[in-house]
Amino acid sequence: MAELPIAPVDRLIRKAGAQRVSEKAAKLLAEHLEEKALEIAKKAVDLAKHAGRKTVKVEDIKLAIRS
């Protein structure tokens, strides 16, 4: 189960043009977004470690997103 709240995900889907959103659809998207965010975060942590830092910086996140 996703840790991301369902309500903001529901709003994102509605912002994309949906009039109604099922709870299952919002939960599935939340799970996918969480998996993708975790993947990016792990890459960013590796980049920070490689640079000899413990702190993840915005540059690490940007680079992780591009890779």
From Swiss-Prot:
Protein name in the entry: Archaeal histone B
Complex formation: Homodimer or heterodimer with another histone. Dimers then assemble into higher oligomers, with the DNA wrapped around the protein core.
Keyword terms: Chromosome, Cytoplasm, DNA-binding
Function: Binds and compact DNA (95 to 150 base pairs) to form nucleosome-like structures that contain positive DNA supercoils. Increases the resistance of DNA to thermal denaturation (in vitro).
Pfam families, sorted: CBFD_NFYB_HMF (PF00808)
Source organism superkingdom: Archaea
Gene3D superfamilies for this protein: Histone, subunit A
GO cellular component, one term: chromosome
